[in-house]
Amino acid sequence: MARYRGARLRITRRLGELPGLTRKSARREYPPGQHGQGRRKRSEYAIRLEEKQKLRFNYGVSEKQLIRYVRKARRTTGSTGQTILQLLEMRLDNTVFRLGMAGTIPGARQLVNHGHILVNGRVVDIPSYQCRPGDVITVRDRDRSRKLIEANMEFPGLANIPSHLEFDKPTLTGKVNGIIEREWVALQINELLVVEYYSRMA
């Protein structure tokens, strides 16, 4: 399944608030479609599927990428669900977003893809790059790059920078000081249901 490029508010009406995908809120509380206002009871599978879809659309990853993160999380010690969240949160595109350099994760991904972002002094144009403690994230020393990010910072996607990051606004320099803690994940999600969804599939 490819990365979604359709109407974002249609997705938030179906899945709820997705802070990484869009800053806008859906006007209607019920899902889109002819039968969106129905109250039909959902199956356990449908509930687990919805939680999985929240991850995919919020972080902008394909099904294949998400399966890779699930498999990687299973090979580590500790909570598989929390590890999946940490892997997604520590992606470069998400880190740029959480530092306030872009209003959404798709916007941050575009900055990375176009070579505006440096990690430890080198251009990294891979959005899925896994940031590590000690990484220093800066803006390429070009007038266009700096103006883009300064404009983005006028309208940040989220108000608070998580505790594992620090950011110096005058120099547009961010630093990764650790791995994100669960309480700082902005997406409202039950990651255990995601693990259950993939228990027989990934």
Swiss-Prot record:
Gene3D superfamilies associated with the record: Ribosomal Protein S4 Delta 41, Chain A, domain 1 (1.10.1050.10), RNA-binding S4 domain (3.10.290.10)
Do you know which InterPro entries this protein is assigned to? Answer: Ribosomal_uS4, Ribosomal_uS4_bac-type, Ribosomal_uS4_CS, Ribosomal_uS4_N, S4_RNA-bd, S4_RNA-bd_sf
Q: Which UniProt keywords apply?
A: Ribonucleoprotein, Ribosomal protein, RNA-binding, rRNA-binding
A Pfam family that the UniProt record links to this protein? S4
SUPFAM superfamilies linked:
Alpha-L RNA-binding motif
Residue ranges occupied by any S4 RNA-binding domain in the UniProt entry: 90-152
What are the GO cellular component annotations? small ribosomal subunit
Q: Which superkingdom heads the taxonomic lineage of this protein's source?
A: Bacteria
The cysteines covalently paired via disulfide bonds are: none
Named from the GO MF annotations, one term is: structural constituent of ribosome
Keyword set includes RNA-binding: yes
Output the GO biological process annotations, alphabetical, semicolon-separated.
ribosomal small subunit biogenesis; translation
Q: How does it assemble?
A: Part of the 30S ribosomal subunit. Contacts protein S5. The interaction surface between S4 and S5 is involved in control of translational fidelity.
Name assigned to this protein: Small ribosomal subunit protein uS4
